Amino acid sequence: GYRSKGISTYPFSAYIGVFALFGSLLGANLATDIDDKIFNKILSIIMIIVTLLILLSPKVLKGNLPERLKGKNLLKSCIIFFIIGIYGGFVNAGIGLVIMLFLSIYNRMNLVKVNATKSVVILIYTIGAFLTFLFNDLVDFGYGFSLGFGTLFGGWWASRYSVKKGERIIRFFLIITVVLLSFKLWFF
């Protein structure tokens, strides 16, 4: 993965991951039924907006500005990731794009570091949401293992490929994925 290629944002990723974990516990406990069609349309719009914001981020962020990972910026990031964790525990869908938006614009990370940090945060906060749903007997292990294996393999492969190929390939796959998923969510 990323660490084997020398990409790590530890301890920053651990701190924000723990705050996201606490948020996900709250979000998963607040989870309620939402009409699927309305939810899918809202999600497709959110995904497109977040992707556009990442791709069209202000030019000032394209420069050589230092990352913001310590001090008051770490504190602000922890608070925001608690809120992101609530959303992740409640809905989860599109969470990767929300995390990418914040890390790239506020923390000024390049997309390779964004993806490395996102992977750690999602791993940590998913534990809280999973345990909440498990204790409420809402886990389908057949689907879960299938999805988990695909995510694990895909994430490992993508991490190695993105470090090798850089930010440009991440942007390409981000656009393709969001367009296809948004189309599916809106029309199907």
Describe these PLM feature segments:
Residues I48-L55, F102-R108, T151-W156:
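Alpha-helical transmembrane segments and their membrane-interface exit regions
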Residues S8-Y15, R108-S119:
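Membrane-interface alpha-helices at helix entry/exit sites of multi-pass transporters
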Residues I38-I45, L75, A116, V120, ...:
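Alpha-helical transmembrane segments of integral membrane proteins
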Residues L65-N115, F145:
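Selected transmembrane alpha-helices and immediately adjacent juxtamembrane segments
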